[in-house]
Amino acid sequence: MEPEAPDSRKRPLETPPEVVCTKRSNTGEEGEYFLKVLIPSYAAGSIIGKGGQTIVQLQKETGATIKLSKSKDFYPGTTERVCLVQGTAEALNAVHSFIAEKVREIPQAMTKPEVVNILQPQTTMNPDRAKQAKLIVPNSTAGLIIGKGGATVKAVMEQSGAWVQLSQKPEGINLQERVVTVSGEPEQVHKAVSAIVQKVQEDPQSSSCLNISYANVAGPVANSNPTGSPYASPADVLPAAAAASAAAASGLLGPAGLAGVGAFPAALPAFSGTDLLAISTALNTLASYGYNTNSLGLGLNSAAASGVLAAVAAGANPAAAAAANLLASYAGEAGAGPAGGAAPPPPPPPGALGSFALAAAANGYLGAGAGGGAGGGGGPLVAAAAAAGAAGGFLTAEKLAAESAKELVEIAVPENLVGAILGKGGKTLVEYQELTGARIQISKKGEFLPGTRNRRVTITGSPAATQAAQYLISQRVTYEQGVRASNPQKVG
């Protein structure tokens, strides 16, 4: 097949070429390179412009050629279109800066979750997406971005101030590409993306995957999210049968087939201060993993709430499971009321809850308002923080400053339970560090605390971060001990 002639009109190509990943030179004509970018569907229209005028003008100004996947041809597991940019390094950076500007203009309506089953991922946009850039790079380029022992990506983050994460590398199956997520303020993201473009220039195989459609790709492709499964798929949820069973057991399947949790936010007035912040943090965590928190207010009783949250926790990754378990404990507490009744699972110490919320605030888990926060608004934790601040001045500037001091905490974890904290390939440990902002280190295998079979777990960070990490680890250990007690055959 003859190669397609260049389009002299510089108009975007929306008819995807054949899906193919092959070894080829990293440049096009006259030192041009390729950069593949994910674009949220809400931003595509403003990038293309009426009748394609905006993108045509962008191509004229930068000298780049820009191709987009068709309007409903999304990257697997997302509602984002694939954009392939061809041009000089300067052109790639200029086009991406324009795209990033449009991505930051997230419509207010996109941040409002739809009322759907909490056990299903929501289709609305996470406000944090406005502060992210998502690039798709071949494995070879990903290796250069990471560098030996992670040295290169660490340097990029230190020099740019952005947070750079790559989708998980699977064991066994070798994915052709990986997704790079860059998070931060506009200038930070720009610096990090420029550094990534430099690695694209250095990689002879950086143009090996130039497809913009994944509709006919055979085999798995990389997950657009930096944590969780390496493979692109719908958000991790319970299988349909298990979800239906859990919902039916909790009396949640009404005429509309909706599953909701009435304890939140209906029960929020019963809590205040650190408890309120902890609840809102947990809600925000579930939302960040694709669970619909809007359906948490459908007026169902707390017993039903606990049932659904337990079902969510059973099928979620550790960070989301910890959030769901925390909400379940509060749902039980709200249901018990002053009259008592069944004793709810004991909530964690107030100090840990407050620290968990503070750590979330310090590490960007507050959520963002429309327009990257410039227009006010914010996620549920923002409102909770304001309410708590009004009630008792919980999040004062002085207290936040005090929380910035570094602290070292050591805890003991039984040898046979260390695997539960590490997770497969260390994923659970990575998630806990990302969620809290603390650094967590586990002593080497065979290195025990004197006179015990316990490994030493060292947590370093601000007091908020260390307490939050300690809480997550203790919750995980307690949960794993309970599972093994009820199922003695379970190991590791």
Swiss-Prot record:
Gene Ontology cellular component terms for the protein in this record: cytoplasm; nucleus
Tissue expression from the record: Brain. Expression restricted to astrocytes.
Gene Ontology terms for molecular function: mRNA binding; RNA binding; sequence-specific mRNA binding
Record-listed cross-link Glycyl lysine isopeptide (Lys-Gly) (interchain with G-Cter in SUMO2), residues: K112
InterPro entries: KH-I_NOVA_rpt1, KH-I_NOVA_rpt2, KH-I_NOVA_rpt3, KH_dom, KH_dom_type_1, KH_dom_type_1_sf
Domain spans labelled KH: 32-99, 130-196, 406-473
Domains: entry comment: The third KH domain (KH3) recognizes specifically 5'-YCAY-3'.
Name of the protein: RNA-binding protein Nova-2
Gene: NOVA2
